[in-house]
Amino acid sequence: MDLDQIVADAQQSFEGAADITTLENEKARFLGKSGALTELLKGLGKLDPEARKTEGARINVAKQQVEAALNARRQALADALLNQRLAAEAIDVTLPGRGAGAGSLHPVMRTWERVEQIFRSIGFDVADGPEIETDWYNFTALNSPENHPARSMQDTFYVDGKDADGRRLLLRTHTSPMQVRYARMNRPPIKVIAPGRTYRVDSDATHSPMFNQVEGLWIDENVSFADLKGVYTDFLKKFFERDDILVRFRPSYFPFTEPSAEIDMMFEHGKNAGKWLEISGSGQVHPTVIRNMGLDPERYIGFAFGSGLERLTMLRYGVQDLRLFFENDLRFLRQFA
């Protein structure tokens, strides 16, 4: 067989192999145990020494050419496979980069910390208490009688079971119980705020069954309604970082304060200019509540207020729907990062 023809056939066969398996099969035709070149090498023993030397050299040259073609095709197939994998795993550098998002405080938690900071700066302590309360601390101690509508299951989440004294358990409807607990553990003068989660049977665009509230209490021998007005007005100006806030106190009713007032505020400028916005409930602490705190109402007097942290956050940032704070939509939350 013509060696040049064998080399040409091998090169053509190798070039036509579409994958490694086919290439190895084609290799066996030329370099395998029964391959064309192998058979020629086996036949050298039949030749005389001089012819064997000459023919063996020619066959070895042909074999080297076939092996070179084989290795070249192997490399080409390996490169093609690598390029295919790279294409499948390629990163499109024309796409916008995705930055590593930095964590940030929830807007309501920003308000929580800001409120704490402001009141700490004027001498108030910060207290915390249980979210599962007894009806005595949540209602009775705060001068809410047994037949008060707030005690109904339509307004309050009750918990199965009772405490060690047989009192009913519930999810606190405000953080006022912590004021009673704090006052029973500390002697006047008492200046404290109690921020925390509270629960009521309510849910719409401006109400949530779980919401955050901050309540404040100042009790001493000579604390007046004027002190309440001064403290809360100063708080609003610091919280909203503006001095164009007008504040009014509207007569109202709360069982735990007497007299009681709703606190409204109005901006002189901006999109809420000219609108009175309800911001808090307040009043002089009722003598019965002071007595339930273990204090003498003939000697001590004070004021209390309560504000929704979501409400403050909505007004500060211009949020219209309370439910946005609880949906965990990153598009919304990133605006406050």
Curated annotation (Swiss-Prot):
Keyword terms: Aminoacyl-tRNA synthetase, ATP-binding, Cytoplasm, Ligase, Magnesium, Metal-binding, Nucleotide-binding, Protein biosynthesis
Reaction(s) the record says it catalyses: tRNA(Phe) + L-phenylalanine + ATP = L-phenylalanyl-tRNA(Phe) + AMP + diphosphate + H(+)
Name of a matching Pfam family: Phe_tRNA-synt_N
Enzyme class: ligase
This protein's record includes keyword Metal-binding: yes
One GO cellular component, as annotated: cytoplasm
The EC number(s) this enzyme carries: 6.1.1.20
Keyword Thylakoid part of the UniProt annotation: no
UniProt similarity note: Belongs to the class-II aminoacyl-tRNA synthetase family. Phe-tRNA synthetase alpha subunit type 1 subfamily.
Cited NCBIfam families: pheS
Protein name listed in UniProt: Phenylalanine--tRNA ligase alpha subunit
Gene this protein is translated from: pheS
